[in-house]
From Swiss-Prot:
Protein's cellular compartments: Cytoplasm
One cellular component term from this protein's GO annotations in UniProt: cytoplasm
Predominant location: cytoplasm
Cross-referenced CDD domains: ABC_RecF
Organism: Clostridium botulinum (strain ATCC 19397 / Type A)
Pfam families linked to this entry: SMC_N
Family affiliation: Belongs to the RecF family.
Name of the molecule in the record: DNA replication and repair protein RecF
Gene name as annotated: recF
Keywords: ATP-binding, Cytoplasm, DNA damage, DNA repair, DNA replication, DNA-binding, Nucleotide-binding, SOS response
Function: The RecF protein is involved in DNA metabolism; it is required for DNA replication and normal SOS inducibility. RecF binds preferentially to single-stranded, linear DNA. It also seems to bind ATP.
MF annotations from Gene Ontology: ATP binding; single-stranded DNA binding
Length: 364
């Protein structure tokens, strides 16, 4: 798949911008705060219905306007997709795909698949487990509508259970029993799907990581959960929830479940989060992203669009070379402040250059 064109009205610093894209490599060059990342953000939003930079949709609207409009035309092997999104300052939004109204975000996902790599993605390795859970959830939601549904249901029931814990009495105890059964059902599915995804990452990611590091490093991903028997995860999770209820009542929160899980990234059997160098951590994220590309390709039969937001300057020459030599079959949209460092690795015949200045884009 690839994006043919993008039309933005009142989006961030763009008044009215229409952009034709190459199906190959697109490079947006400009100083900071000129609008390069805004282009990627609009594409990312058209893919999953949320921004990678803010939780507030109103932040996407040009400061003096009441709404913003995004149109993304996507070329697919079977059926092209036109995604139209209107976002209003009052919190409402309207989304259509090929003029059919989208009622749930799950109906939007899968029409345009993207994988984004930005400097902030280093948090997946370095920071709290929540960043790693978010990575897994986003990648799984792209390819599995059932996962999206069960994740939404799990979080809804989890919130209700936590509220019940804060207002506990003997009657509420029976309600918590019902919540525990529901959490076990949805939670077990989430745990098993996350573990399966990490199994796929291990198979694909190991080969990618060896290519990047010239066979010097071996990477491994391991899911960290209190559940020991994945085949009986629902039963085991229910037992542990009941066992931990007293502790949960004291803390007014649910202490166990997929919302507390994590995954470990190790290089040569060493925990990358704690002991890895910054270079190793960046390479681990690079492996995650390129493995995710391959997983999506294996499932839907097409590569997603790759978005690289000012990350090439963060990589050494070997990593830059790997990235630019690996995208010949993938529509890639790159933002950077200059192309001097990567110019020697670019396929000029397959690359389109754009200059970005204060919300204006010039094709070179």
């Amino acid at each position: 798949m690839y994006i043919k064109n993008v039309h933005l009205i009142n989006f961030r610093n763009y008044d009215d911008m229409y952009l034709e894209l190459s199906p190959n490599t697109n490079i947006f060059v400009g100083n900071n705060a000129q609008g390069k990342t805004n282009i990627l953000e609009s594409i990312y939003y058209s893919s999953i219905g949320k921004s990678h930079r803010t939780n507030k949709d109103k932040d996407l609207i040009k400061w003096d306007k009441n709404n913003t409009y995004l149109r993304t035309y996507v070329s697919r092997e079977r059926l092209d997709k036109t995604i139209d999104i209107n976002i209003f300052k009052n919190g409402k939004k309207a989304i259509t795909v090929n003029k059919i109204k989208i009622k749930k975000i799950s109906e939007l996902m899968g029409n345009l698949n993207v994988v984004m790599f930005s400097p902030e993605d280093l948090r997946i390795i370095k920071d709290s487990p929540g960043n790693r859970r978010k990575f897994l959830d986003i990648e799984l939601c792209k390819i599995n509508n059932v996962y999206y549904h069960d994740l939404v249901q799990y979080n809804k029931i989890l919130s209700e259970r936590n509220t019940a814990l804060k207002n506990w009495n003997n009657k509420i105890n029976d309600i918590i029993d019902i919540y525990d059964e529901q959490l076990s059902k949805y939670g077990a599915f989430i745990i098993k799907e996350r573990n399966k995804y990490l199994d796929k990452l291990n198979i694909i990611g190991k080969n990618i990581h060896k290519k990047i590091t010239n066979d010097l490093e071996d990477i491994n991903f391991r899911y960290l959960t209190n559940i020991k028997d994945f085949d009986n995860a629902e039963k085991e999770l229910l037992i542990v929830l009941k066992k931990n209820r007293k502790k949960d009542l004291e803390r007014n929160s649910t202490s166990i479940g997929p919302h507390r899980d994590d995954f470990e990234v190790s290089i040569n059997n060493i925990d990358t989060r704690i002991f890895g160098s910054q270079g190793q951590q960046r390479t681990a994220v690079l492996t995650l992203k390129f493995a995710s590309l391959e997983i999506i390709k294996n499932i839907i039969g097409e590569y997603p669009v790759l978005l690289l937001d000012d990350v090439l300057s963060e990589l050494d020459s070997n990593r830059q070379k790997f990235v630019l030599n690996s995208i010949d079959k993938i529509q890639t949209i790159i933002t950077c402040t200059g192309i001097e460092e990567i110019d020697k690795y670019l396929d000029k015949k397959q690359s389109q250059l754009y200059l970005v200045n204060n919300g204006k884009i010039k094709r070179v």
